[in-house]
Amino acid sequence: MSQMNSVAMQNGKLHVKQIDIPTPGPGQVLVKSLACGICGSDIHITRHTSDVFDIYKNLGIMAKDAGDDQEVLLGHEYAAEIINYGPNTKGELAKGTRVTSVPILLSAGGAGVGVTPGLYGAYSEYFIVDEALLLPIPDAVPSEAAAITEPLAVGLHAVNRAQMDNDDVAIVVGCGPIGLAAIAALKLQGVKHIIASDPQESKKQIALEFGATEYVNPTADDEVATAAALAGSNKVVIFECAGVSRLLNDYILRAPAKAKIIVTGVHTAPLNVNFAYATVKELDLIFSYYYQPEEFAQSLENIASGKIAWQKMRTGKVGIDGVQGAFDTLFKPNDHIKIIIEPWRTGELEKVTG
């Protein structure tokens, strides 16, 4: 077999195409995709391709004159199986070993797997990773669980960036995968007051199960006032995990003095923000995006040790031909947390309960 199926995003649309199975280069490994989560950033790049590509061009990820019709082979939250090693590799893990990794290619200048034009992503049957970043998946950890390692690492990194005291009060805004990951990390860190804020009442139960001590519907109650009352002389720390642009200025206006705001949501459009309030109140505004390899490894260990109930985060699964339908579902209001793609099979979106 020399060809494989791959999901490509182009001009805001997804399609399944047949392409050649890639050949691993020096230091690289060919892997078979076993499970891959649909990330909010996959949705964002599909809906706002031009905005994302403008950022890529300004950061030097894409050429300045590159067109917006570039294909992206999506998929960066993965579990995979080692198929073949490229040259200049050690081959310490046997072929057939299940692995995951930080989704970048050091051998390609640190480019992101599944988000960068020209690279292979894990929505494909096969793709390329770096040997140096491989982590074996423990036998007791299902592949779909290991695919949730990446968003857990994003949440863990945000919490580490916050440098909270356990008596500080956390507000986690948005109870999607990153928000839940942050809640879980806060709980494991020992933070005593964790307020989950989400307008979808359906998110209340899972937020509490992941470790929130309180749930607030922000359309009905003031989560910032609730946190400030609990904090007393301690700090309020707001984790913006929703990616809703207007919320950033809103929290700058409402946050109490000396509060911290940790921004994990990706805002690609220009924002109208009045920083005078942040200056006068001496707010700490911290942006959090990626994570360290140690945080990724810790997230996999948290799954393996049962510290995080990953099953409750996984709400759907789909085969490679059903990915467009899954995206259509996620484009609209829905109750899904994390949909797992299994590129090795076909099949439409199915709901899964934890």
Annotate the PLM regions.
Residues 245, 249-253, 293-354:
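C-terminal hydrophobic helical "lid"/dimerization subdomain
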